[in-house]
């Protein structure tokens, strides 16, 4: 529920219009922007892994855990996409102090992830694309549940990270 209110507050703050200059501080959020057809709005990204060709020439604002605030501010973003672990809290607070809108992606469930995709589409002026991407994600999850509904649950759990 907390995430819902955070998304609602973000959308209210962006109600004057869709973000035009976006910096993504998480490769997963960059991928979502591309899926939404909003690559033209990206002006900077955080380095992390292989870059999709669509953003190959975009300036880097740092890497995981080390954001170059001066470089980021030079890009004059009106929206910054953040995965909480990708930016130290002190830097996150400085971004808030500058008054730049933040889209903080912190889903705690698959349903919240679907809501996040729709909210991101709205924030980027791609509301219909956001709804379609959210619906496609939900449908994919439904198909997986249907496909494996009769299988015995696995007795093994492999955790990649303790704070996904």
Residue ranges of model-derived segments:
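Bacterial N-terminal signal peptides
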Residues: 4-13
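Pocket-edge positions in alpha/beta enzyme catalytic cores
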Residues: 7, 61-64, 105
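Intrinsically disordered, low-complexity boundary segments flanking structured domains
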Residues: 11, 32, 46-48, 142-147
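Generic signal for short, ordered secondary-structure residues
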Residues: 12, 40, 51-52, 74-75, ...
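Extracytoplasmic substrate-binding proteins
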Residues: 18-21, 89-164
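A short, structured surface patch at a secondary-structure boundary
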Residues: 20-21, 25-75, 79-91
């Amino acid at each position: 529920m907390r995430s819902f209110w955070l998304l609602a507050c973000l959308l209210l703050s962006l109600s004057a219009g869709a973000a035009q200059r976006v910096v993504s501080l998480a490769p997963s959020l960059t991928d979502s922007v591309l899926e939404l057809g909003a690559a033209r709005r990206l002006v900077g990204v955080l380095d992390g892994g292989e870059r999709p060709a669509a953003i190959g020439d975009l300036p880097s604002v740092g890497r995981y855990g080390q954001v170059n605030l001066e470089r980021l501010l030079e890009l004059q973003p009106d929206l910054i996409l953040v995965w909480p672990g990708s930016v130290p809290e002190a830097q996150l607070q400085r971004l808030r102090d500058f008054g730049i809108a933040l889209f903080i992606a912190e889903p705690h469930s698959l349903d919240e992830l679907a809501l996040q995709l729709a909210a991101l589409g709205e924030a980027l002026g791609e509301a219909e694309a956001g709804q379609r991407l959210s619906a496609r994600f939900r449908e994919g999850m439904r198909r997986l549940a249907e496909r494996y509904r009769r299988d015995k649950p696995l007795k093994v759990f492999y955790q990649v990270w303790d704070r996904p």
